Each structure stands twice: as C-alpha cells, then as structure tokens.
Design a protein with these regions (language model features):
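Charged, gly/pro-rich active-site loop segments
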Residues: 1-16, 91-169
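Short, basic/aromatic recognition patches
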Residues: 8-36
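Anion-coordinating catalytic cores for phosphoryl-, nucleotidyl-, and glycosidic chemistry
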Residues: 17, 71, 82
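A generic structural signal for nonpolar/aromatic side chains embedded in well-ordered alpha-helices
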Residues: 29, 73-74, 119
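Short, solvent-exposed loop/turn elements at beta->coil junctions and helix N-caps
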Residues: 39-42, 87, 135-140
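Beta-strand-connecting loop/turn residues
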Residues: 58-59, 78, 155
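Active-site-adjacent structural patch at catalytic or cofactor/ligand-binding sites
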Residues: 65-66, 76-86, 95-104
C-alpha cells in the first residue's frame, strides 16, 4: 500500500468536488478536443478508445471507419459511455463530464456531411469538406464509403469540477 502525507483538509488550496451546471457542461463539451468512448466487448469486457468529437443539439458526434473493432462493438451493443476531462497543474483542479447514452451509426453520405463539416471546422483542417469534394480528389468517394459518423444521444449526463475552497477552478 502506498502511503504519503495526509491531506490538510483545512487547506485553502484543497480541491473539492462540485456539480457542474447544465450551462457549464454545454460549454465544456463544446470546447473539448478529445473524448473517450467506452463500450462493452461482445465477451463482456470493457473497451475504451479516444476520439475527436463534436457537440451540438445535446448530442455527441464523431467519425469512425466503416469497419473495425469499434464498429463491431457498436453494432452489437449501442449502449455507450462518453467522457471528456481537463486538468490543470497537478490534477488537483479538474473538470469531467460523463455521458451515458446510445450510439447510432450514420452511413448515409448526405446525413454524414454536415457532421463531417463541423468536425473539419472544429479541428481547423485547412480546407472545407465541400472544397475537398470539388478538388477532384479521385479517392474521395472511396474514402466516404469507408467513413461513418457516430451520433450519441444521451440519456444521462453528469459533470463535476474540482474547485479550491475559495471557488477558483
């Protein structure tokens, strides 16, 4: 067992957990860069993978390949958990949002494109999706065949922040 000094519970720098408001959660999810998608393997074990994501209209969206372990898992069991966090300094100041929901896979190109455009904009890809399509990239249609968009509809969202006793994050 690891032992160390006991925390000074009276210290003004001690970070205490506090629930985030709906507004704080929305702002945090909008600004987040990487989320962790938690799923259950067909044999019952956990599987978690980091993904770039977007957030809008109360839903999480991400792009993925049309084939692979993630797709196999989501097709077998669409119930997911999605987590985004941020920490400052020594991790004593942190924020974390956890979403419990159901993932839907979008394969229709017309439905996927608005989500892909938002992801391109968020991650500052130097060309818009429309420009990419117009450039005559011969592989673009093949690439679209290999891409899917995952859309998570939450049924529960929790958010916590660890703040110092003086209220600072």
């Amino acid at each position: 067992m690891i032992q160390g000094p006991k925390p000074d519970l009276q210290s003004p720098s001690l970070a205490l957990p506090k629930d985030m408001s709906s507004r704080e959660i929305d702002q945090f999810l909008t600004c987040g860069r990487v989320g962790r998608l938690g799923m259950i393997l067909p044999e019952g074990g956990p599987y978690i993978v980091p993904v770039g994501y977007g957030y809008g209209d109360g839903k999480i969206y991400f792009h993925t390949c049309s084939e692979g372990l993630k797709m196999e898992i989501l097709q077998a069991n669409p119930n997911v958990c999605f987590e985004v966090d941020e920490s400052i300094s020594d991790c004593s100041l942190a924020k974390s949002v956890i979403i419990f929901g159901r993932a839907e896979i979008i394969a229709d190109k017309k439905e996927m494109i608005p989500y892909l455009e938002k992801l391109i904009d968020k991650y500052r890809v130097p060309v818009t999706f429309g420009e990419y399509m117009k450039k005559g990239n011969r592989d673009v249609q093949e690439e679209l065949e290999q891409v899917r968009v995952g859309l998570i509809t939450p049924h529960k969202i929790t958010g916590q922040k660890f703040v110092r006793k003086n209220g600072n994050f």
